[in-house]
Amino acid sequence: MSSDYFPSYDGKLPKVKKHHRPANPESSLHLKHRETARIFLLNPSGELFLIKTHWDPGTGLPPRWLTPGGGVDKGETILEAAVRELFEETGLKVKPEALGELELSLPFKMEWVSGHYETGIAHFYRFVVTADFKMDDSNWTQDEKRDVIEYRWWNIADLLQSGEIVGPPGLAEYLENHFSGR
């Protein structure tokens, strides 16, 4: 992505301000729609596993924390993508039924400084690991090896008070409302 693209967050997420708005709103262009499958990965203490990543090179944006997950491939169900992504990003092998029912589908819109925008829906499942879970990053893609800064378990209250950017837009509010007291 070109360095003139900067997203704007909604809600309680920290704001990354646009440098300008297009003079003609009709000139906005919808770049793409992206479906993602993500997992609320919890440990027995109720802490949430998150991965801190860079944006695409050249954006100049600050890093953000994401749950394990990624894009749904063509011909793949959301559940199949969640199982695949969980293995690729954490090394954790689970059967689809272990993820249970879809917990959340969070639509989002990323607006860029050029006036262009992307839309998407992040679909979330929940899984609780056993105390002996060990993170395995051996299945990461080259992009993940380049983009991942760190990963860790977060107490939800600490995360929400940290000032860290959590994505996608709207996720911080969901965590605050549905994972309170953890």
Regions found by a protein language model. Give the residues of each.
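A short coil-to-beta-strand element that immediately follows conserved catalytic motifs
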Residues: 93-104
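A generic structural micro-feature
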Residues: 29-32, 61-64, 115-121, 143-148
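Short, P/G- and charge-enriched loop/turn segments at secondary-structure junctions
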Residues: 20-29, 110-115, 138-140
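Active-site-adjacent beta-strand/loop module that shapes the phosphate/pyrophosphate-binding cleft
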Residues: 43, 106-137
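Acidic, metal-coordinating catalytic segment for phosphate/diphosphate chemistry
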Residues: 2-45
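Nudix hydrolase/Nudix homology domain
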Residues: 2-6, 57-58, 63, 133-182
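Conserved Nudix-box catalytic region and its N-terminal flanking loop in Nudix hydrolases
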Residues: 47-89
